[in-house]
């Protein structure tokens, strides 16, 4: 059996969904995905398009193929539109969470052992959703506030995330 590859380069077309949703994605053939020899159902990679800044993402199954969603910000950064053939470099994502851990949240978890246990008891996908949510604000005070809100939410809801409730809690004023 061949060794799993750490990096794969290929060309593919940036495709727009035919449903009218506006979603743009890269189609990845199953033969390319097979080169990574993923061991679990989660297929996380770091993707670079046309030599642009790399981003962490999932290879999402779609019949016999896989796809990677490419949002407008990333399309604009590399100057591509639907129909463009692009150079793609995929590297197997071997990071702990599949997204960077915001520094502020890491510090909150370090200081709050109960919050740390509750966060790490969540499924990998829920952890990534929280990390993505907490990495969005540019303001450091808001990132700290939101990290504290998330930990409080976990404690108040027996380690569960109740999406609608959490989103409302995140809107409350800091002071």
Predicted feature descriptions by range:
Residues 14, 43, 70, 74, ...:
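Functionally constrained cores in energy, signaling, and assembly domains
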Residues 2-67, 72, 79:
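A positional/architectural concept
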Residues 1-3, 81, 85, 89, ...:
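Mature exported/compartmentalized surface modules and terminal targeting/interaction regions
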Residues 74-76, 137:
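Short, surface-exposed beta-strand-loop junctions and turns on beta-sheet-rich folds
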């Amino acid at each position: 059996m061949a060794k799993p590859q750490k990096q794969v380069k290929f060309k593919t077309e940036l495709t727009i969904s035919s449903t009218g949703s506006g979603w743009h994605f890269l189609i990845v053939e199953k033969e390319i995905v097979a080169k990574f020899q993923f061991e679990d159902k989660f297929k996380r990679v770091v993707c670079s398009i046309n030599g642009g800044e790399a981003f962490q993402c999932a290879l999402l199954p779609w019949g016999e193929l896989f796809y990677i969603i490419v949002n407008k910000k990333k399309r604009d950064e590399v100057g591509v539109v639907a129909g463009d053939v692009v150079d793609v470099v995929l590297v197997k994502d071997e990071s702990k969470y599949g997204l960077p851990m915001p520094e502020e949240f890491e510090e909150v978890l370090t200081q709050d052992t109960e919050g740390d246990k509750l966060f790490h008891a969540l499924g990998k996908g829920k952890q990534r959703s929280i990390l993505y949510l907490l990495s969005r604000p540019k303001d450091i005070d808001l990132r700290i506030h939101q990290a504290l809100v998330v930990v409080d939410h976990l404690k108040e809801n027996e380690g569960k995330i109740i999406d609608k409730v959490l989103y409302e809690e995140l809107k409350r004023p800091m002071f």
